[in-house]
Regions:
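A residue-level marker of the well-folded mature domains of exported/periplasmic proteins
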Residues: 22-372
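Positively charged n-region of N-terminal signal peptides that target proteins for export
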Residues: 1-8
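Intrinsically disordered, low-complexity Ser/Thr/Pro-rich tracts
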Residues: 1, 17-23
Length: 372
């Protein structure tokens, strides 16, 4: 009997040590992103690295170029690297079936950023996400409203024929923006029968400057009468290529360019006429996905096998150097929308309070907190 009690005691102590060791382990979160070095990706990395430092979290990055095979492989890579959680910017929602399966099998929490699974377009993946204990949720923008707003800005600037450059056919974010562009055109034309807008079918410029430029030039060559070009996104390099192509044709300022994903020199681009307007400031989106996964790992946010968290992040719009100035002062360079103390405080919030903080983020919000 004494031997049995001694064995039970030893096992209890061993289990206690194992639990303690696990509790003391540093949290590790993987980030699967199209690129951590382009305009938007590097800004995302800057804020996530700051959050990781403030919360004492290890981060591992994988750049997957929005190539489907690399997106799904990135989840496997990060799971094998002993990540406790993953945040991912996938390309097509179909990829999430494999990603969620990998995370379920490895008991790794996962959240999407800049993306959400549409229940109508991808019902199987949506059902899989709802049923997964390890799929935490998604942080994303209202791409539909973003698209409508940009088209409205072009209409107000007098544009009549708009070219459209996407980056990857079937990309969920592009599809949402495209629906918004089309709805914006329809709404504008219904209210301005004497000044209708025509939106061309999309051409795809991938995510490099070379392909972005070649695609923009091809659109212009096929439609020399366009007076506007929407470069839907793609991380920034696609837009830089398109701007270079327009400049090479001597059409800077003659073709109004709008896009999503703020460039680091947007003020100069607005001043020169290379850009007419841009939506952006959303590089903090993955920061909130990071906090979702962080809290799921710590057990603060319960995950469900019949639903997930869905957080909407606000876009900011600028159409002049003046409107960009405040953003540049408080969001770029060495500045971040949240400092270390604020990051720690956000990490302690309930989900509802965190979602409210996310929805409230704006230039005015940051100025109020950080203005000296």
């Amino acid at each position: 009997m004494k031997k049995i009690l001694a064995l039970v005691l030893a096992l209890s102590m061993l289990c206690g040590l194992m639990v303690t060791a696990h509790a003391d382990d540093k949290i590790k979160i993987g980030v699967s992103i199209w690129s951590s070095t382009d305009t938007l990706g590097s800004e995302c990395k800057r804020l996530i690295d700051a959050a990781a430092a403030a919360l004492d979290v290890d981060v591992q990055w994988v750049d997957q170029a929005h190539i489907s095979e690399q997106v799904t492989a990135s989840a496997e890579t990060l799971a094998m690297a002993d990540c406790d959680g993953i945040i991912i910017c996938n390309s097509a929602s179909a990829e999430m079936g494999s990603v969620i399966k990998t995370c379920d099998e490895n008991e790794v929490y996962v959240a999407q950023f800049f993306r959400v699974i549409d229940p109508d377009l991808n019902p199987d993946e949506y059902a899989q996400a709802k049923a997964s204990k390890y799929y935490v949720g998604a942080v994303h923008e209202s791409e539909f409203d973003n698209g409508k707003k940009l088209v409205t800005i072009l209409g107000e600037k007098g544009c009549k024929k708009i070219g459209l450059e996407g980056w990857e056919p079937g990309d969920a974010t592009f599809q949402g923006r495209w629906e918004g562009y089309k709805a914006g055109v329809e709404e504008w034309n219904a209210a301005h029968a004497d000044a209708p807008i025509e939106l061309l079918e999309p051409q795809y410029g991938r995510t490099t400057t070379d392909t972005g430029r070649a695609t923009a030039e091809a659109i212009i060559d096929a439609n020399p009468d366009i007076d506007a070009l929407i470069v839907a996104g793609g991380g920034g390099d696609t837009l830089l290529g398109a701007i270079a192509g327009i400049e090479a044709k001597g059409l800077t300022g003659k073709i109004a360019v709008v896009s999503t994903d703020f460039l680091p020199d947007l003020d100069a681009k607005l001043q020169s006429g290379a850009m007419a307007a841009e939506s952006g400031g959303h590089y903090a989106d993955p920061f909130f996905a990071f906090l979702l996964v962080y809290n799921a790992i710590k057990g603060n946010y319960e995950t469900s096998e019949d639903g997930f968290y869905n957080m909407v992040f606000p876009y900011m719009f600028v159409d002049s150097p003046e409107s960009y100035a405040a953003y540049a002062q408080y969001f770029t360079g060495s500045e971040l929308p949240y400092n270390a103390d604020e990051i720690k405080a956000l990490a302690e919030l309930s989900y509802d309070d965190l979602a409210a903080a996310c929805a409230a983020l704006s230039v005015e919000d940051v100025v109020a907190r950080h203005a000296k």
